[in-house]
């Protein structure tokens, strides 16, 4: 498998829209190289006769019947809020102007 260069890491970071500090490039280069070496090892495993799957353990969703439930009265819900303004909840500002 070919060696991963610092330029390869910069390119992957750019494609992933990651802003990597220059001092971390060498670290990530080594880590990416290790990951790709491991993938190379996985490629050598004989999977002849093994059925394709998307997960190692079969999972089944547990569902329930849909049912109609009463909707709480809007006024009761609004009255539980610490602050309200008319028919709306009043919440602290979280975005700058």
Swiss-Prot record:
It is an enzyme of class 6 (ligase). One of its GO terms (biological process) is regulation of translational fidelity. Allows the formation of correctly charged Asn-tRNA(Asn) or Gln-tRNA(Gln) through the transamidation of misacylated Asp-tRNA(Asn) or Glu-tRNA(Gln) in organisms which lack either or both of asparaginyl-tRNA or glutaminyl-tRNA synthetases. The reaction takes place in the presence of glutamine and ATP through an activated phospho-Asp-tRNA(Asn) or phospho-Glu-tRNA(Gln). The keyword Aminoacyl-tRNA synthetase does not apply. Keywords: ATP-binding, Ligase, Nucleotide-binding, Protein biosynthesis. InterPro entries: Asp/Glu-ADT_sf_sub_c, GatC. Its EC number is 6.3.5.-. Gene3D superfamilies: Glu-tRNAGln amidotransferase C subunit, N-terminal domain. GO terms for molecular function: asparaginyl-tRNA synthase (glutamine-hydrolyzing) activity; ATP binding; glutaminyl-tRNA synthase (glutamine-hydrolyzing) activity. This is Aspartyl/glutamyl-tRNA(Asn/Gln) amidotransferase subunit C. Belongs to the GatC family. Heterotrimer of A, B and C subunits. It holds the Pfam family GatC. It catalyses: L-glutamyl-tRNA(Gln) + L-glutamine + ATP + H2O = L-glutaminyl-tRNA(Gln) + L-glutamate + ADP + phosphate + H(+); L-aspartyl-tRNA(Asn) + L-glutamine + ATP + H2O = L-asparaginyl-tRNA(Asn) + L-glutamate + ADP + phosphate + 2 H(+). The lineage of its organism: Bacteria, Bacillati, Cyanobacteriota, Cyanophyceae, Synechococcales.
């Amino acid at each position: 498998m070919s060696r991963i260069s610092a330029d390869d890491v910069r390119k992957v970071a750019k494609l992933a829209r990651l802003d990597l500090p220059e001092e971390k490039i060498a670290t990530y280069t080594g880590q990416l190289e290790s990951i790709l070496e491991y993938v190379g090892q996985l490629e050598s495993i004989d999977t002849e006769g093994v059925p394709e799957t998307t997960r190692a353990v079969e999972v089944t969703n547990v569902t329930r019947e849909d049912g109609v439930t009463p909707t709480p009265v809007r006024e009761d819900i609004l009255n539980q809020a610490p602050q309200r303004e008319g028919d709306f909840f009043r919440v602290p500002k979280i975005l700058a102007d």
